[in-house]
Amino acid sequence: MTHSQDLFDRARDVIPGGVNSPVRAFGSVGGTPRMMVRAAGPYVTDADGVEYVDLVNSWGPAILGHARPEVVKAVQDAAALGLGFGATTPAETELAELVTERVRVAGVDGSPDRRPVEKLRLVSTGTEATMTAIRLARGFTGRDLLVKFAGHYHGHSDSLLAEAGSGVATLALPGSAGIPEAIAAQTIVVPYNDLGAVRAVFAEHGPRIAAVITEAAAANMGVVPPLPGFTAELARIAHDNGSLLISDEVLTGFRVHPAGYWGLDNDGLAADHPDAWTPDLVTYGKVIGGGLPVAALGGRADVMDHLAPLGPVYQAGTLSGNPVAVAAGLTTLRLADADVYRALDIAADILIYAVELAFDRAGLAYSVQRAGSLFSFTFGTPPEHGITDYATVQAQETWRYPAFFHSMLDQGVSLPPSVFEAWFVSAAMDEASLDRVIRALPAAARAAAAATPPA
């Protein structure tokens, strides 16, 4: 028995399923989860001393790699001053200033820069950020209905688990038990990338719709970017009907571009360009905390000022703006310069090419989806129009992934334990770590090709 197996058995005695987040249980790939005990640079090490190239990277935050010395020192220095005060600290303002300044695209032809985040409220988790954004949208508009897209994951609050991605997709769940029908009925789910469905919903329910929430680029059902012009038209439909557009950048924010996916999608576009769009509210997580629990919601000042203590929409949190966590986030964002984003894109380019080569040589049918440095693969022949929505993602040959995953794991590469999750590279990936992944791919591709569907 491995030490990981022994530790996992102990965990199952006192923790439901042995994990504190379902996807970690290896439910869709089988086998025993590795108990990780150490991480540095592009590597993680398990309780048995086995080292892996990490393509999970804490599900997104570790864009610099693990245990970056400057981040570790910032955390140590902050902890030495106190783990928490229950009061506002200067670093919270610094982080809010950094985000409001960073989330911008340069003006075109002399027009001013576009800056959608005028004010920011810090929370501890992405779920809190999206939950609060929904409450704020309802409080600001005085309306009750919410529109979301099938396969988009916005955390595990009651309003947002309907036809969600991430662990809900991994476990093949329709949503979650424990959500009253009255709450579920306030969320309208439509197919992603389907503007006709959006227009139909607004035609029927427009005066009651508080907001449309969308992942800036879907990354929790695999990576599925919006079709060209989709989000811009979505914003127009929402605004024409007096509703708000909420862009969920918990996963994409500060990972795919210095200004998140909004920056990637709007860079170089004038404000009046047909494909330009500006959200009313944005949610952040992952990278903004540098690996510690920080998330945020931001947006238009007139909307944000409806939050207490200025307005009637209540939100609070004992650990919101925790000084140690904020120190990690501040330092990570300050270090995430153009060289970091260049390194992320290069690593993604190399790995995508290597996977495609291995899959082609193994005779696999597949599709690759990408948003900046985020990418994923689906097994099976894609439809002619490509992978554009939850239905096409779910139709893939998911049964090939466990064989692929375990072959990579056995060769020292840690991938997300679900075909519905993105691969995360880090700027710490060097020639040696990339080479280990590349050398592992041919055998893993052959294992996937040899897999058979369950009886």
UniProtKB/Swiss-Prot annotation:
GO terms for cellular component: cytoplasm. Keywords: Cytoplasm, Isomerase, Porphyrin biosynthesis, Pyridoxal phosphate. Its EC number is 5.4.3.8. The modification N6-(pyridoxal phosphate)lysine is found at residue 286. InterPro entries: 4pyrrol_synth_GluAld_NH2Trfase (IPR004639), Aminotrans_3 (IPR005814), PyrdxlP-dep_Trfase (IPR015424), PyrdxlP-dep_Trfase_major (IPR015421), PyrdxlP-dep_Trfase_small (IPR015422). It is found in: Cytoplasm. Pfam families: Aminotran_3. Gene3D superfamilies: Aspartate Aminotransferase, domain 1, Type I PLP-dependent aspartate aminotransferase-like (Major domain). SUPFAM superfamilies: PLP-dependent transferases. One of its GO terms (molecular function) is pyridoxal phosphate binding. One of its GO terms (biological process) is protoporphyrinogen IX biosynthetic process. It comes from the Bacteria. Homodimer. This is Glutamate-1-semialdehyde 2,1-aminomutase. It comes from Clavibacter sepedonicus (Clavibacter michiganensis subsp. sepedonicus).
